[in-house]
Amino acid sequence: MVEITEVIEPEWQTRNDIQNLVNQKTLQWVFVGGKGGVGKTTISSSIATALAETRESVLLLSTDPAHSLSDAFGQKFTHEPRLVNGFTNLYAMELNTSQIIDGLDGLRETHSFLKNVPDILMMLPGIDEALSFVELMQSVQSRRFSVTIFDTAPTGHTLKFLKLPDVLEKILDSLLKLENTMGGLLQLFSSMTKAQMSQNELFDKIKLLGDMINTTHEQMKNPDLTTFICVCIPEFLSVYETERLIQDLAKSEIDCSYIIVNQVLKHIQLGGLIEDAWDGLTEEQQRIMTPFFEKVREHHSTHNSRVDVQRKYLSDIKDLYQEDFNIVAVHQNKQEVRGKDALVAFAKKLMQHSPLPI
């Protein structure tokens, strides 16, 4: 009698596509980041078009000061969500965090979240940036999009951006610990501002603000709600920054399970085609065509040398991440990816099985 053993598939398996990402209906925040020039905007825009196929409403938001969303879609975007041409449920906006910081005072007069920020807190160094992040997340969430994709700034700015809730949470925790010992002093400082308040009222506001920030922070650390996609190219600096980014995301407890390796080159195999073509020419033709054939050989050699360099870093990426990450390889496009049709086509590539070519 043959014994039948039940085969149990593991709950989570790595893939070489973004199928699971697109099908994960619980996701609310998708951050796309990496070194400058690796194609983050193309990737984030393409993912947004794919999510628009499965989600009720999608917001694509650029926080990179050097905005490129308008170029990617061939449509002007501003700091307010605007419907992307050709879609009924995909919106895009370009926003600098500095714009939020500059407008904090005005927003505090009208926004329920910022009304709870005591004047004394605005004196703390770095508080404006931290509040701008929480204000951004609260504002986006209030618009009730099913999912928001962030096209982020280069790595260094992104890491600072993502650490802001943690920074603000620690500041408020420190203030709350001073409630008994320095409450009177804080109240004295508070009395010097526009809005005077009692010690209890001051700390009640700090606690309420802390609860709001804690909620945002917990959402950021919940892999069912938030994930980060690293985009890189197979070059030293990009791979180095990707490792740095992954390490920092791990320290911040932010889920990162996708790495998209962009601009991967293919080997050009000419074999004996050049020699056969050369041998088929007369001496006169060879004399005329010599410069052309030399250029072909030079470009062929240069291209394949670049491919060999890329293969080294592709191998490093595979060794470092293949067991724990969904790694998607995207070959170098012949043309710029611009406009709805090109972005949708690019998204289809990301949805297909695309392992590293090594």
UniProtKB/Swiss-Prot annotation:
UniProt record similarity statement: Belongs to the arsA ATPase family.
GO biological process: tail-anchored membrane protein insertion into ER membrane
Example of a GO cellular component annotation carried by this entry: GET complex
Protein name: ATPase ASNA1 homolog
Known partners and oligomeric status: Homodimer.
Top-level taxon: Eukaryota
Major subcellular site: cytoplasm
Keywords in alphabetical order: ATP-binding, Cytoplasm, Endoplasmic reticulum, Hydrolase, Nucleotide-binding, Transport
Catalytic center residues: 64
Iron-sulfur as UniProt keyword: no
Xref: InterPro entries: Anion-transp_ATPase-like_dom, ATPase_ArsA/GET3, ATPase_ArsA/GET3_euk, P-loop_NTPase
Protein role: ATPase required for the post-translational delivery of tail-anchored (TA) proteins to the endoplasmic reticulum. Recognizes and selectively binds the transmembrane domain of TA proteins in the cytosol. This complex then targets to the endoplasmic reticulum by membrane-bound receptors, where the tail-anchored protein is released for insertion. This process is regulated by ATP binding and hydrolysis. ATP binding drives the homodimer towards the closed dimer state, facilitating recognition of newly synthesized TA membrane proteins. ATP hydrolysis is required for insertion.
